[in-house]
Swiss-Prot record:
It catalyses: tRNA(Phe) + L-phenylalanine + ATP = L-phenylalanyl-tRNA(Phe) + AMP + diphosphate + H(+). This is Phenylalanine--tRNA ligase alpha subunit. It comes from Lactobacillus gasseri (strain ATCC 33323 / DSM 20243 / BCRC 14619 / CIP 102991 / JCM 1131 / KCTC 3163 / NCIMB 11718 / NCTC 13722 / AM63). The keyword Ligase applies. PROSITE patterns: AA_TRNA_LIGASE_II.
């Protein structure tokens, strides 16, 4: 067998092997055996020095033609296997568009936001405006404007996070009231506002305490505002949130920014006032604090306390949610357990 017959035989055998190859691995083996560094066609090229000079160009040309033919067939076979793999994956992963889609999971409002949105809508309906102020407040607006000068002993009740000597994380939203009160034009009508927002106290977090919680404070200032106006407003709030059959009572209390000051209780909705562990067997549950605006608060804002008076109240949105929904641990509000939050989806309607 002369050299040209050998080259032609390698071509025919190579084409036959490529045709019978079943996968890419077999194609790679054929390529290495024929055209690799030690492949048979490569060895022929390496032996050119032993070939007669007049035959070298023809042998080289013949070997390169065979290499090109084999490489073309290898590429086509490789592409065939690749297309087969793609087709198989498409078949395995295809989607039947006629099948029903997965049902979307609806989110739900946070229980505190449910209470907040409900109360905001309720107060707006009664002519109040909603005001939101800064969470980083000044000592002046948080305390001094609220009849709590720097030497006032009641400051010890606040357990404040101070940033520096003048700035702090607000312990109450009363600063919003002070800012609005000193700018309000009473020639255009009375002042009626609520101020919701986050407040901060230096409390250790446990089942009933949190260093951050949410409040809503209300303020009404006008001529001839009486304690009866306050009592009626508080009763409407309690019945709106906790049910029309709730009974209410006011107890004397003390707050530096109101005089007189009261705390409001509602009849226990667990035992209907008969006495149980929730109400500590008193039949009553404390829900908020309130009172008639202290004359010093009015004067600090530039309002003549001999002409104008008013009432203020403050309620904890967290506490309202705890009482209304029977939540036992305040930490549930901020641990982001979807199972806990999903319980309140029906309350949004």
């Amino acid at each position: 067998m002369d050299l040209f017959d050998r080259i032609n035989k390698l071509k025919e055998e190579g084409l036959d092997q490529i045709k019978q190859a079943e996968n890419q691995k077999m194609l790679d083996k054929i390529r290495v055996e024929l055209m690799g560094r030690k492949g048979e066609l490569t060895q022929i090229l390496h032996s050119m020095k032993d070939i007669a000079p007049e035959n070298r160009p023809k042998v080289g040309q013949e070997v390169n033609q065979v290499r090109d033919i084999l490489q073309k067939q290898l590429d086509e076979a490789k592409d065939h296997f690749l297309q087969a793999i793609i087709a198989q994956k498409l078949e395995e992963e295809k989607i039947d568009v006629t099948l029903p889609g997965r049902e979307g999971h609806l989110g739900s409002k946070h229980p505190i936001n449910i209470i907040l949105d409900d109360l905001e809508s309720y107060f707006i309906g009664m002519g109040y405006k909603v005001v939101q102020g800064p969470e980083i407040e000044t000592d002046h607006y948080c305390f001094e404007m609220m009849n709590l000068p720097k030497d006032h002993p009641a400051r010890d009740m606040q357990a404040t996070f101070y940033i520096d000597n003048e700035d702090l994380l607000r312990t109450q939203t009363s600063g919003d009231q002070a800012r609005v009160l000193e700018k309000h034009d009473f020639s255009k009508g009375p002042l009626k506002m609520v101020g919701p927002g986050k407040v901060y106290r230096r409390d250790d977090d446990d089942a009933t305490h949190s260093h951050q919680f949410q409040q809503m404070e209300g303020l009404v200032v006008d001529k001839n505002v009486t304690m009866s106006d306050l009592k009626g407003t508080l009763e409407m709030i309690a019945k709106h949130v906790f049910g029309q059959d709730r009974k209410t009572r006011l107890r004397p209390s003390y707050f530096p920014f109101t005089e007189p000051s009261v705390e409001m209780d509602v009849s226990c909705f667990n035992c209907d006032g008969k006495g149980c562990p929730i109400c500590k067997y008193t039949g009553w549950i404390e829900v908020l604090g309130a009172g008639m605006v202290h004359p010093n608060v009015l004067e600090n804002a530039g309002v003549d306390s001999t002409v104008y008076g008013g009432f203020a109240f403050g309620l904890g949105l967290d506490r309202f949610a705890i009482l209304k929904y029977g939540i036992s641990d305040i930490r549930d509000f901020y641990t982001n357990d979807v199972r806990f939050l999903a319980q309140f989806r029906k309350e949004e309607d």
